[in-house]
Amino acid sequence: NIDFANTSGAFVSGEADYTVEFEPAATLIEEQGAGYVVASVGKESGYVPYTAYSVKKSYLETHKELLEAFTRAIEKGQEYVNTHTPEQIAKVIAPQFKDTDRKTLEKIVERYAEQDSYKENTKFEKESFTLIQDILEEAGELEKRVDYET
């Protein structure tokens, strides 16, 4: 059992035979010649709603316009990544990845596009909702399923 922050280091040093990494760590391991990306957990598992935003009902009721604007901003970002090149996207996101060079960012963005990681909209599909509940249930983290229509 290795702390998540140390998984790539453990793999590169030979303490682990495999690792599951987020980007940019996965691509950096490849660039160091220390390993290869052989599969995408996301692609192999199906679309899992990995990132979600939630607020209390009281906040929703008092900040409806703000939350609608936030949702439009997310959709605008989705539209951007679906209509621009990896080079253009890498240029925009580069300030968020100060320790990662532009070519590496381009490679990561391209990999995500090839894996169909970028959604076209913010709709939380029933199939994905069921899949995340299956995963949580199998892990023993879900006491009771929630109806999609709720």
What feature does the model see in each segment?
Residues 56, 125, 150:
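Residue-level signal for threonine
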Residues 1-3:
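Short beta-strand-to-loop elements that line the ligand-binding cleft
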